[in-house]
């Protein structure tokens, strides 16, 4: 990617962000975001990645409030004990715990899955929520560009390693669910199969958007595989909107200033940002339904290229090669 292309990528990302913020402002002026009513889900088990902060924390808290056994997967050991205690206190649910998982390390992901499976409990909901946003160019422990490696590839590996447990846990009328958090930036993203690591000319904006596009393609292909084998597991992808969290530390200074001064008005709260993830995880309306892109608890169209099954397959096969996952679609 040339410097000019990198500049264009930044402009496109900020343009789509501004459009989402404007839509949120208009909705707030018309009455705001009303909290959906979610059914209780006792005796269900959920894993939430990135559950110590922001949208992930709100998601974990609300699932615990619904009676679920919630396992927070994260790499913030120092904050974990406080977060777990707070959620238990607020929800009166003692079935909340933390397991260390660094999504930037395949070794850590595999260790997390091993520890989880040693518990001998089912898994009904996996929420792929964790991520980084527009960070400077750097690599994961396995040598992947961080947006691609953590946001996308880490969740690709985690999901595949947990699929057997999800399949065992799902049943007719009570499907297990994979919920993956993408973003509106995928609408302005490009997937460069020849340079997934953004090594030619790094743009944090393009790299972030590409990782979110990859998550949509991954979800759609995963759903096709699950449906083809008749398993009682569904996969959907959600867009939380522009949410007032701490992930904006690397964005343009004007965006940080707007967030600081007007975030309360222009941005969704973390709870509001979590509602679509929770909806996808528990609503009876989506029982047995997968392959949807959800925004504000409603299905909407994703970028046209995400429906390209050949591209889905290419990314899936490449991801299997990168992670050592067996490509069953070959």
Curated annotation (Swiss-Prot):
Pathway of action: Protein modification; protein glycosylation
Main location: other
Reported effect, residue 215 to F: In CDG1DD; likely pathogenic
EC number: 1.1.1.441
Record GO biological process: dolichol biosynthetic process; positive regulation of autophagy
Pfam family, one: adh_short
Cross-referenced Gene3D superfamilies: NAD(P)-binding Rossmann-like Domain (3.40.50.720)
Tissue expression pattern: Widely expressed. Highly expressed in the pancreas.
Name this polypeptide is given: Polyprenol dehydrogenase
């Amino acid at each position: 990617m040339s410097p000019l292309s990198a500049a264009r990528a930044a402009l496109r990302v900020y343009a789509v962000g501004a459009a989402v913020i404007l839509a949120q402002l208009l909705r707030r002026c018309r009455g705001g975001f009303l909290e959906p009513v979610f059914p209780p889900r006792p005796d269900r088990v959920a894993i939430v990645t990135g559950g110590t902060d922001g949208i992930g924390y709100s998601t974990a808290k609300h699932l615990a409030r619904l009676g679920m056994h919630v396992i927070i997967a994260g790499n913030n050991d120092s904050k974990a004990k406080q977060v777990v205690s707070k959620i238990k206190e607020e929800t009166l649910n003692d079935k909340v715990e933390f397991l260390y998982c660094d999504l930037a390390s395949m070794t850590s992901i595999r260790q997390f899955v091993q520890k989880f499976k040693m518990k001998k409990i089912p898994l009904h909901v996996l929420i792929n929520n964790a991520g980084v946003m527009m960070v400077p160019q750097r690599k994961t422990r396995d040598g992947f560009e961080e947006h691609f490696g953590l946001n996308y590839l880490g969740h690709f590996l985690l999901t595949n390693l947990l699929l057997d447990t999800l399949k065992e846990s799902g049943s007719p009328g009570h499907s297990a669910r994979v919920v993956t958090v993408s973003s509106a930036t995928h609408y302005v993203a490009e997937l460069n199969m020849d340079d997934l690591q953004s090594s030619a000319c790094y743009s944090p904006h393009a790299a972030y958007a590409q990782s979110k596009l990859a998550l949509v393609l991954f979800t759609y292909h995963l759903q096709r595989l699950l449906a083809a084998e008749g398993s009682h597991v569904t996969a959907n992808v959600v867009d939380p909107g522009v949410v007032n969290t701490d992930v904006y530390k690397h964005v343009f200074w004007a965006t940080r200033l707007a967030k600081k001064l007007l975030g309360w008005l222009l941005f969704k709260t973390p709870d509001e940002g979590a509602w679509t993830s929770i909806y996808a995880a528990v609503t009876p309306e989506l029982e047995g339904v997968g392959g949807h892109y959800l925004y504000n608890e409603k299905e909407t169209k994703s970028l046209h290229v995400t429906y390209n099954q050949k591209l889905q397959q290419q990314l899936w096969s490449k991801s299997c090669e990168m992670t050592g996952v067996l490509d069953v679609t070959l």
